[in-house]
């Protein structure tokens, strides 16, 4: 799918505010890709489409989870977790996107996971730091992403803040988010490469 078609699809489906967020994620991911030698066309496509299913009916999302066998564990969660995996499945099976990196970046943009590809990392970070975000402490994360040279450390910090937020709100934390946090935790002295 070319980027113009992706933008057209997203604009037709998403509320204006969410569509603009998606464009900002794509733009932010491109900037990060230029810093970290990523694929700008892949991150642009994933950025534009990452929230394509965010407002889909929850019943429809559960149906997609079952239809494409995305994992029964997902059936315990709402749209905040489901929209990524559901969107990736729809983009693959209904829109013919077959680039695994783009699909994985869409699938895990909210939760993260262990051993993310560079494209996944760039979308995960861009979704958190795009200019429209006003999350407390986001400027520190932006500085880390743009100026401190480590995607992995940035992912760890985002995951840590996300998990702490969810715990404070008594919201169940998705297992892949915990796995992501643990995997990118530098305090255990594992060495990782961006």
From Swiss-Prot:
CDD domains linked: HDc
Activity regulation remarks: Inhibited by EDTA.
Top-tier EC class: hydrolase
Subunit structure: Homodimer.
Family: Belongs to the Ap4A hydrolase YqeK family.
Cited function: Hydrolyzes diadenosine 5',5'''-P1,P4-tetraphosphate (Ap4A) to yield ADP. Can also hydrolyze Ap3A, Ap5A, Ap4G, Ap4U and Gp4G, always releasing ADP or GDP as one of the products, but it exhibits a marked preference for Ap4A, which is mainly exerted at the substrate affinity level.
Protein name in the entry: Bis(5'-nucleosyl)-tetraphosphatase, symmetrical
Organism per entry: Staphylococcus aureus (strain NCTC 8325 / PS 47)
